[in-house]
Amino acid sequence: MKERNISIKSKVEIQELFKKGRFIRIEGINVFYEFTCLAISRILVTFPRIFKGAVKRNRVRRIFKECFRKQFALLKDRYVDFIFVVYPQKADVNYHEVETILKNIVVYIMKRNM
């Protein structure tokens, strides 16, 4: 069975999330999030135009998506759409840093929305 796609791809959904979503800034990363009625949490990793180098952008994107995929259990049956805007100072981020950042974000969101 094919795993569901965890990416947000619709331009309308992305614009709506930027407008209506809640906002957190953590360590050079802006996070927009909104609870959703879908049966899956989704993610979009994007970068400002000043972030040059496709190889670095794609590496950061892969790391974020993999960490997010492994952190599904922390959301405890709550489904959230996330947009991560990653700035150039986080270009050399490693897997364990991203894992820690995502755990902190999920814990913060769950505390805030209990």
UniProtKB/Swiss-Prot annotation:
Catalytic reaction list: Endonucleolytic cleavage of RNA, removing 5'-extranucleotides from tRNA precursor
Disulfide bonds listed in the record: none
Superkingdom to which the source organism belongs: Bacteria
Keywords from the named record: Endonuclease, Hydrolase, Nuclease, RNA-binding, tRNA processing
Leading EC class: hydrolase
EC number(s) given by UniProt: 3.1.26.5
One GO-annotated biological process of the protein: tRNA 5'-leader removal
GO terms, molecular function: ribonuclease P activity; tRNA binding
Transmembrane segments: none
Pfam family of the protein (one): Ribonuclease_P
Subunit annotation: Consists of a catalytic RNA component (M1 or rnpB) and a protein subunit.
Similarity comment: Belongs to the RnpA family.
NCBIfam families named in the record: rnpA
HAMAP family associated with the record: RNase_P
General function of this protein: RNaseP catalyzes the removal of the 5'-leader sequence from pre-tRNA to produce the mature 5'-terminus. It can also cleave other RNA substrates such as 4.5S RNA. The protein component plays an auxiliary but essential role in vivo by binding to the 5'-leader sequence and broadening the substrate specificity of the ribozyme.
Protein's recorded name: Ribonuclease P protein component
